[in-house]
Curated annotation (Swiss-Prot):
This is Ferredoxin. Disulfide bonds: none annotated. Residues 2-29, 29-56 form the 4Fe-4S ferredoxin-type domain. GO terms for cellular component: cytoplasm. Gene3D superfamilies: 3.30.70.20. [4Fe-4S] cluster 2 binds at residues 19, 38, 41, 44. InterPro entries: 4Fe4S_Fe-S-bd, 4Fe4S_Fe_S_CS, PSI_iron-sulfur_center. One of its GO terms (molecular function) is 4 iron, 4 sulfur cluster binding. Its cofactor is [4Fe-4S] cluster. [4Fe-4S] cluster 1 binds at residues 9, 12, 15, 48. It comes from the Bacteria. Pfam families: Fer4_7. It comes from Acetoanaerobium sticklandii (strain ATCC 12662 / DSM 519 / JCM 1433 / CCUG 9281 / NCIMB 10654 / HF).
Amino acid sequence: MAYVINDSCISCGACEPECPVNAITAGDDKYVIDAATCIDCGACAGVCPVDAPQPE
């Protein structure tokens, strides 16, 4: 399983530096998690102020 960032993302960028495998990048409207790279650690979810990263 991987995490996905839902539409509540405010593009604050808090999640990107927390990802230990660099699976998070800035998208057009929100940040995006590469499911093939994500290791399901939940680090992104732990720092997100709006709980946008959710388990897929």
